[in-house]
Amino acid sequence: MKRPMVLATTLFTTTVAGSMSLHVSAGEPASINLAGFDFTPTLKLSERYDDNFRGLNNDEKKSSWISSIHPSFILEAETRNSGYQLQYDVDNQTYHDDPSANHTDHILAFRSVLEFNSRNRLRYDLGYKRLEQTVDTADNVDNDRLTIKNAGAGYTYGSFQGLNQLDGHVDYEQRRYLNPNGVNDDRERNTTAFVGTWYHRLTGKTRALTEVRYTDFDYLQSHNPRTSIGTAALVGLSWEATARTTGTLRIGEERKDFNDSARDDRSPTWEAGIDWKPLTYSTVSLSTRKAYDEGNDDAIAIHQQKTRLGWKHEWSSRIATELNASHADLEYEGLDREDRTNVYGTSVSYAVRRWVTVKTSYQHTRNESTESTEAYTRNIYLLSFDFSL
């Protein structure tokens, strides 16, 4: 097995002159002011060892040292009633023991918020992603290559502190695959989604909510059994700073109507995210979700129930640790297959300087499946360096 290349430490010297000035906020990367625009560059260098980077059965798994160079650039501006942000990320990953897995991911996103007055706000976003994935492909030898384009817009009526608030959001996404021999072309789709939410304030810190969702999954392949309409109706609560907790809870029913099949599935659905801060420097997070996801591996849909528990503790202004564990049950609709996935992770980060953070982490994944060839274990060991201005 090849040894990893030694990560080189690059020293950056930034000259600030003329209309350029350096803006620094505690705990955040600094930005350069460029004639009214805030420009924030960051760089993440990492080296990791992945003993099963394609997520294969233990008899077939492949391991490698992986070097990553991940710069990120954010350009943003704010006025009295609006905000704009343009972000570009590029992540180059080198697999030292399998060059065929080498790839570079590109992510471009634009976001904007317009506040007409205290009761009316408009937001919209555009995005483009060109990705390669070593897992989740019908081909266990080559990467899964795809592009994702999306456009979305949302409107909020009513102030956050008011008695009632209405929020609506529409989103359109195109997903295309770039694999040779048409691998995963059956998963190409256009997705149109709408979410509408009504919030009603119960107390100063707690709001009740009612939400409806509509999603049209239009697959390009003719008579694709995954083409469907997803709908859901949910009720719940949203609260802030109540007994040191913040969170949102939604529970309801979800339905998935397939166009080319007599099968229509419905099930209880829920989403919850709760943060508990027993101390100002310690946070326990719990999230859970039960819902239908789009199918793969010949399944027309995947019914997933997942729970995650995490704990982040700041031991000092420089040192922080994280522990997390998650469990997921997956039912593959249309197949006689059920998976159970457990993931455990831990990390330690050390802020060497305000602009340099070193992090080491470990993650273990175990997937058990009624389909014996889909069972696997995976371990990832990582060392990273985060740089900013």
Kindly give the residue locations of the regions a language model identified.
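Gram-negative and organellar
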Residues: 25-389
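Cleavable N-terminal export/targeting peptides
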Residues: 1-31
